[in-house]
Amino acid sequence: MARAKKVDDNQKEIVQTFRDLGARVRVTSSEGNGFPDLVVQYRSPMNRRLQTLLVEVKDGSKPPSRRKLTPEQEKFHAEFICYIVESVKDVYELLEINYCD
C-alpha cells in the first residue's frame, strides 16, 4: 500500500531553480509507490539535445539517515535511471551548468 509522500523542505527551491534554468518541471511527489518527486525536461545549450530526467529531491540539510531512499524508492531506482538532488548546486551539476555561489 502506498504511503502518503512527504515533500522535502527544499523542493520548492529546487523546482524554481530548474525552471529558472529553462527546464520544464512536473511535480510528481504525490504519485507515491517510489516514483520520483519530479519529472524534468531540459534542452542542453551545449548540444541542443532534449533530456527527460526523473529526479528525487532530498533535503541536504538533514542528516544522512533522514535522506535515505525508502524501500519503494530503492526498487524504482533499481528499475529506472533516477537522479537525487539535495541542493541548488546539485541542480546546476545535473544540468552541467557552472554554479556560482
Q: Where do the PLM segments sit?
A:
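Catalytic phosphate/metal-binding cores of nucleic-acid and nucleotide-processing enzymes, i.e., regions
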Residues: 1-101
